[in-house]
């Protein structure tokens, strides 16, 4: 029963969509109607710029941190892992926004940095490096998620943590499936390219 409660609580925390809330109350727009249509920090960056995206990113990271800490408090590491997946699912598919949320990257950063700070930091550094080199946020995001999963293979903690890392990476990749198509076609937007607000 505790596992279910932790999962539901973490999911609801994830459903607090900071991109939607921030842009709705500061610009009176639904961020999902602009740019990529994604309710996440990257799309806020693309549409409104870094000053608007920064608080959204930080708050999304904190969602992951809070959910994992709550899960760990109630059930230990198994609870942390369940909460980590659930909070990302809440961010991606928020019930309050008709299941149209973000892609879970910033929230995943908070999750992995709380579960395994060292491996999380390495994965984050590699992801950021890919973004800096290629200018593709999507490619860096997927690279970071895959790196975290691979690191858990080479530096195993437990089967549960490895399974968690693989599931998390699959969630990130799944949410970027349209980006993958655009990357292949050469039409993916690079960081710094701004979308127009009509």
UniProtKB/Swiss-Prot annotation:
The transmembrane segments are 3-23, 65-85, 111-131, 153-173
The protein's name: Glycerol-3-phosphate acyltransferase
| Gene from which this protein is expressed | plsY
Q: In which pathway does it act?
A: Lipid metabolism; phospholipid metabolism
| The species this protein was found in | Caldanaerobacter subterraneus subsp. tengcongensis (strain DSM 15242 / JCM 11007 / NBRC 100824 / MB4) (Thermoanaerobacter tengcongensis)
Member of which family? Belongs to the PlsY family.
Q: Which keywords annotate this record? A: Cell membrane, Lipid biosynthesis, Lipid metabolism, Membrane, Phospholipid biosynthesis, Phospholipid metabolism, Transferase, Transmembrane, Transmembrane helix
Which cell locations does it reside in?
Cell membrane
Q: Offer one example of a GO biological process linked to this entry.
A: phospholipid biosynthetic process
Biological function: Catalyzes the transfer of an acyl group from acyl-phosphate (acyl-PO(4)) to glycerol-3-phosphate (G3P) to form lysophosphatidic acid (LPA). This enzyme utilizes acyl-phosphate as fatty acyl donor, but not acyl-CoA or acyl-ACP.
**What general EC class does the enzyme of this chain belong to?**
transferase
Q: How does it assemble?
A: Probably interacts with PlsX.
Record's catalysed reaction(s): an acyl phosphate + sn-glycerol 3-phosphate = a 1-acyl-sn-glycero-3-phosphate + phosphate
On the tree of life, the source organism's domain of life is Bacteria
